[in-house]
């Protein structure tokens, strides 16, 4: 019993006798981002382009975006999903103006024509990896739109049937 009391007193003394350090911030902050993906990983290139308003005519080529995939197998078709502010049932695919209201209507497809659009998702018509170019063009004449920045958001992934 005496031994138990001594051990208990020693434990308490060690806990209460521990000094605490103070942290003072004096530098820059850093962070680590980790993205976990499916085995079928699709990477979408980003680009910035500049046009004159008079160039917003039907079928005007806007840009090509490179798509690369790895690890895609049977039953997985490389796909792009039009993200927030880039697709709705009324306008279809579009680029949204920085004012949040105006929309530049666009069409998209693979440079080789081997894909299908299903709502806000465009997928390649075969299983497995696909590395290629997506083409974006102006739909209809749209010179009436205000100048400024328009954005199209895309998410790489895969489509399963």
Curated annotation (Swiss-Prot):
One GO cellular component term, please give it.
pilus
SUPFAM superfamilies noted in UniProt: Bacterial adhesins (SSF49401)
Main localization (coarse): other
Which pairs of positions does the record mark as disulfide bonds? none
The answer to whether UniProt assigns keyword Signal to this entry is yes
Keyword match Ribosomal protein: no
Where found? Fimbrium
Which first-to-last residue range defines the signal peptide? 1-21
Q: Which UniProt keywords apply?
A: Fimbrium, Signal
Highest taxon of the source? Answer: Bacteria
Q: What does this protein do?
A: Hemagglutinins of uropathogenic E.coli mediate adherence to the upper urinary tract. These adhesins bind to the Dr blood group antigen and also agglutinate human erythrocytes in the presence of D-mannose (mannose-resistant hemagglutination (MRHA)).
Entry's family note: Belongs to the Dr-adhesin family.
Name of the featured protein: Afimbrial adhesin AFA-I
Organism for this UniProt entry: Escherichia coli
Q: Gene for this protein? A: afaE1
């Amino acid at each position: 019993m005496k031994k138990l009391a001594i051990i208990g007193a020693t434990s308490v003394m060690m806990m209460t006798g521990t000094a605490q350090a103070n942290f003072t911030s004096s530098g820059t902050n850093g962070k680590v981002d980790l993205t976990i993906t499916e085995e079928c990983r699709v990477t979408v290139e980003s680009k910035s382009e500049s046009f004159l308003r008079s160039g917003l005519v039907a079928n005007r080529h806007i840009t090509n975006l490179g798509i690369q995939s790895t690890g895609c197998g049977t039953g997985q078709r490389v796909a792009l999903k039009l993200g927030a502010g880039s697709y709705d049932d009324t306008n279809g695919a579009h680029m949204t103006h920085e004012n949040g209201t105006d929309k530049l209507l666009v069409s998209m497809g693979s440079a080789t024509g081997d894909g299908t659009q299903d709502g806000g998702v465009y997928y390649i018509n075969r299983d497995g990896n696909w590395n290629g170019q997506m083409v974006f063009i102006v739909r209809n004449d749209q010179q009436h739109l205000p100048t400024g920045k328009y954005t199209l958001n895309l998410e790489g992934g895969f489509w399963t049937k």
